[in-house]
Swiss-Prot record:
It is an enzyme of class 5 (isomerase). Formation of pseudouridine at positions 38, 39 and 40 in the anticodon stem and loop of transfer RNAs. InterPro entries: PsdUridine_synth_cat_dom_sf, PsdUridine_synth_TruA, PsdUridine_synth_TruA_a/b_dom, PsdUridine_synth_TruA_C, TruA/RsuA/RluB/E/F_N. Substrate binds at Y113. Pfam families: PseudoU_synth_1 (PF01416). Coiled coil: none annotated. It comes from the Bacteria. The keyword Isomerase applies. The gene is truA. SUPFAM superfamilies: Pseudouridine synthase (SSF55120). This is tRNA pseudouridine synthase A.
Length: 259
């Protein structure tokens, strides 16, 4: 069966998350319904990341197996037409034919996320579902300094959800940077894989550093405590964006991760 890689953009606001669930509309479910409407095929689409309810994506990647071959751009356009007709807040940015060995989840080398904080006194209107509003001033340089305590290979028990199903809490965090442009503070994180709620837990803890409530040493101590109670608040989902997934460029699609 021909396999296709899909690059997907979505507004996570109306969805219970990426993963198909019984308690509401999901991004995966909407995509599978679009495929069913287009081809009559019942498929199971696999995504590179299972974003939570309210989390957005500008570069989620998924793969799907279809019964016949498609010209990729025609598949993209046809799926987008079905998604638009259904009123879905989802767009297929690109479709690409890939070998059977390609797996959107397990072939991934690195995932990139962005967390957006709007730090200003006035409540958000245009950005209401696009960022975390923090009314108090935040010191982004203090946040960045604290973030560097988390970069590297660590046991991130402190920063994962109690409901996380990953076998191991150990991950290698390649990047955690904080920058500012006017009222907007951006936290950018990169790793091969993340634990459930890990980035939102980072964001909540770094907010406390920006408020002067935690020092970089406090953040390091929280990490080393391996205790969920040492974590700051879990930041709300609307500030989180799944930006991009990196894959091998040499065509070697062997599984790089089983997390």
């Amino acid at each position: 069966m021909p396999r296709y890689k899909l690059t997907v953009e979505y507004d996570g606001t109306p969805y219970v998350g990426w993963q198909r669930q019984d308690n509401g509309p999901s991004v995966q479910g909407a995509l599978e319904a679009a495929v069913l409407g287009l081809t009559g095929e019942t498929v199971a689409i696999r995504g590179a990341g299972r974003t939570d309810s309210g989390v957005h994506a500008s570069g989620q990647v998924a793969h799907v197996d279809l019964l016949r071959q498609w010209i990729p751009y025609k598949l993209r356009n046809a799926l987008n037409a079905h998604l638009a007709q259904a009123g879905q807040a989802i767009s297929i940015l690109a479709a690409e034919a890939v070998p059977d060995a390609f797996d959107a989840r397990f072939s991934a080398l690195k995932r990139h996320y962005l967390y957006r904080i709007m730090s200003r006194p006035s409540r958000l209107a245009l950005e209401a579902n696009r960022a975390w509003w923090v009314s108090k001033p935040l010191d982004h340089e203090a946040m960045h300094a604290a973030a560097q305590m988390l970069v590297g290979n660590h046991d991130f028990t402190t920063f994962r959800s109690v409901h996380c199903q990953a076998i191991s809490p150990v991950r290698t965090l390649d990047r955690l940077d904080v920058s500012r442009n006017g009222d907007l503070i951006e936290i950018r994180a990169s790793a091969q894989s993340f634990l459930h709620n890990q980035i939102r837990s980072f964001a909540g803890t770094l907010k406390m550093a920006g408020e002067g409530k935690m020092t970089p040493e406090d953040v390091r101590a929280a990490l080393e405590a391996r205790d969920r109670k040492a974590c700051g608040p879990v930041a709300p989902p609307q500030g989180l964006y799944f930006l991009q997934v990196d894959y091998p460029t040499d065509g070697n699609w062997r599984p790089y991760s089983k997390t």
